[in-house]
Every structure is written in structure tokens, then in C-alpha cells.
């Protein structure tokens, strides 16, 4: 699927919802544009600020304009220069700050108050704490007994599409992108005439947990929005794992269709919502997902 097709899908879905489609290319540009490049090295800078991210550490460059253009084109740590064989102080501090940010989002918990504020039912996997979640991924693939009973009692049975939200390995991915992806996603699915299940939040969930959810609720398509493992300095990236008619015993990873890198600096959440709606419709039409879908 090329960019033109994606933009057509976005316009179509947003039009059916009675909303104006965003300009994806402009959104991406705005998200990745840095402030004016800074060449002076100062440890007083806020390492998470736009000024620190725009810092250029190459001394006496042959083509300063090339470095300036490169620095403005990405939020990656480029043009940092060297001090002999070693990184410059500012570059090292930014590296450590980005690493800390990524580590924090893995270890943080999604606040219970936030889940309640979104009006979501909260269930959890067999995991009871973050340390166990990181060391026992197998337990994150199954719901606890209380969660199974809660889903049977409080969720719509036999939906065409079931949407699930899980913290995964990035708390920020959920809390930052939620408002921009879930409302247009739910509205788009309903506008498509699909029976949509009750969206809910799974704490300490792994990707394969959607198989059990689909089996319990009898969902034709399960869409899991889960926090991605963060990269250095990028802690807000969300992934969508969609699967048709999942079963715990038979569904394998090749049966899933993944849309990754959903955030303002990658695929904008609103654009991703439109693409997911189109994907769900095609899965239902073809009765397949993953590598079994015709492209």
C-alpha cells in the first residue's frame, strides 16, 4: 500500500464520519521539524528541549548548510561531532537522557485513574506486577480467571470487530495516542456497518493475548493496540496487531497483520485509525489475515 492509497483511505473514512481529513504529510513534517540549529555546547540546556535536540556538534564543518538541513530533517541524534575518538559531552548527555526516557516508559504503570477517565473496563493478564511482566512473557499471553469472567459478563458477544488496548512495553504510547486513535477508529468501524465489541484495557498484556480474547468473545476480527518496545528517545510509538478468527491453539504469528510506528513522528494516529478500519473490512471480506490475505 503506497502513500497515495493511504491518503485516499483516510479521506474516505473521515468523510464517512463527517470530518475533514488531516494532511498526513504536513503532520509528519511538523512532528519531525527541529528548532533552529544550535552550535554552542552548554550543559545548562534541558536535554529534552527542542533547542538541545537541534544542537550541532561538528566543529568548523566544510558545508554548514548541509548539516543544518540534515539536523532539521530528523529528530535522530545526528551531526553530534566527536572529541578525538570520543563523543562530545552534550552528545553523551543526550544519549543518556534518551536512554532514561525509554527505560522510564517501560517501567511506568498506566494509572488506574487514567483508565477510569477513559471509561474503559480494565482486566489483566496472569501477571501481577511489572517485574513479572518483563521476566515472564508467557504469562502475559493469558488472561487471569477474573478477567475471563469479566469479559463474558460485561462485553458484547460475537462482534465483527473487537478492539483491545494494552500497555505492552510503552505506557506513553497508550496515554499519548489514545485520544487521537480510538475515537476515530471506533467511529470508522461503526460507520462501516460493523458490529463493534466493547473496547477494554488489558494491563500487562502481550500480543498473543488477543487470541484468547477473540476465542472467549467469538470475535471475527481482533484489533490490539499495544505499546511498542521504545527506541532511544522515542517512547510514544504504538502498534496495531490485527488477526482474523484467532484461536489459542492454532493461531501463529504469521496470521497477524501489524501496523507499527504509530505516533506523531511516524504514522499519525488519525491516519492509522483510517487504515485499520480499511484493514478490518478487508479481513472480513477475505476471511483471512496476515500472510493469508491477498494484497
Swiss-Prot record:
Q: In which pathway does it act?
A: Amine and polyamine degradation; ethanolamine degradation
Q: Which residues cross the membrane?
A: none
User: How the cofactor binds, per note?
Assistant: Binds between the large and small subunits.
Where does the signal sequence lie?
Answer: none
* Location, primary (coarse class): other
**Annotated GO CC locations:** ethanolamine ammonia-lyase complex; ethanolamine degradation polyhedral organelle
Q: What does this protein do?
A: Catalyzes the deamination of various vicinal amino-alcohols to oxo compounds. Allows this organism to utilize ethanolamine as the sole source of nitrogen and carbon in the presence of external vitamin B12.
Output this protein's name: Ethanolamine ammonia-lyase small subunit
